[in-house]
């Protein structure tokens, strides 16, 4: 059968979208943030453009290209290809999770000064 007409492809994309949703929801919940979007176009509202910018810059330095969106660029947005390999998607989300944790730790440190 043709690649694009296969149910297996559609099922794979749906499954990957669910995996992405689950990981982002867990990351967001850890910091009291909310997720946005659907399917493979999802993000986390981190509360400010300044914070989102710091997170995306840190991700970029770690090899993950990720961008911001939203009225105030407050959403860190994952735009993974539909055909991304699960291991690669997980590795990217690991980087995102770490960089959000680090950014929040920096925020707490600044607040405590």
Where are these regions (language model features)?
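Conserved N-terminal phosphate-binding loop of PLP-dependent enzymes in the Aspartate aminotransferase
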Residues: 1-113
């Amino acid at each position: 059968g043709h690649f694009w007409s296969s149910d297996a492809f559609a099922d794979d994309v749906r499954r990957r979208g669910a995996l992405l949703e689950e990981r982002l929801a867990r990351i967001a919940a850890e910091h009291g943030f909310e997720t946005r979007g659907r399917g493979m176009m999802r993000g986390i509202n981190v509360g400010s453009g300044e914070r989102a910018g710091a997170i995306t810059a840190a991700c970029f330095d770690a090899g993950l290209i990720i961008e911001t969106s939203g009225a105030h660029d407050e959403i860190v947005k994952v735009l993974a290809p539909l055909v991304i390999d699960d291991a690669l998607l997980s590795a990217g989300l690991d980087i995102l999770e770490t960089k959000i944790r680090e950014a929040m730790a920096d925020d707490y440190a600044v607040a405590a000064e």
